[in-house]
């Protein structure tokens, strides 16, 4: 097993904690499987905590109840595609939920996810919650999905301008 730990902090001046995380691991057929998820409700939007907790609950259910059915026939690429499809369905469900209730009209959350199968892994992300690879140098594994990042990649902003841009 891999030692994991998680915690959240409401931060300064926030009325609610919109963060949620998930750490799950299991051994099956001599292989270790780990799912680590961080969701950050979008602070400028109402009820981000509903979105972030919903994402975590669906992914927890997937890991605990669905992943290990038929696992013998799946490689890590198929698991990754299954998760991408699930994240798309989660997004569609969040959009439907947000349209049904006034209080959740503009809810949203970022997502960064690490999945490990023994000696292989992949990372998925939505939004600007980052995943880093730490060795002697800190490296980004993910790219922010923000307008400022798009402008930076297109050459319309410098790195310094992008860090100060309100669209980051």
Segments predicted by a language model, with ranges:
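PP2C/PPM-type serine/threonine phosphatase catalytic domain
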Residues: 1-168
């Amino acid at each position: 097993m891999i030692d994991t730990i998680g915690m959240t902090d409401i931060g300064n001046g926030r009325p609610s904690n919109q963060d949620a995380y998930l750490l799950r691991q299991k051994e099956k057929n001599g292989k270790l499987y780990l799912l680590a998820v961080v969701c950050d409700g979008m602070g400028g939007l109402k009820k981000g905590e509903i979105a972030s907790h919903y994402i975590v609950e669906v992914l927890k259910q997937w890991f605990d109840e669905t992943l290990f059915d038929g696992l013998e026939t799946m490689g890590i690429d198929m698991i990754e595609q299954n998760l991408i499809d699930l994240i798309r369905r989660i997004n569609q469900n969040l959009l439907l939920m947000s349209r049904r209730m006034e209080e959740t009209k503009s809810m949203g959350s970022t997502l960064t996810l690490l999945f490990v199968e023994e000696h292989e892994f992949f990372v998925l992300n939505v939004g600007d919650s980052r995943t880093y690879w730490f060795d002697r140098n800190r490296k980004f594994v993910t790219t922010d999905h923000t307008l400022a990042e798009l402008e930076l990649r297109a050459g319309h902003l410098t790195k310094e301008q992008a860090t100060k841009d309100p669209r980051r």
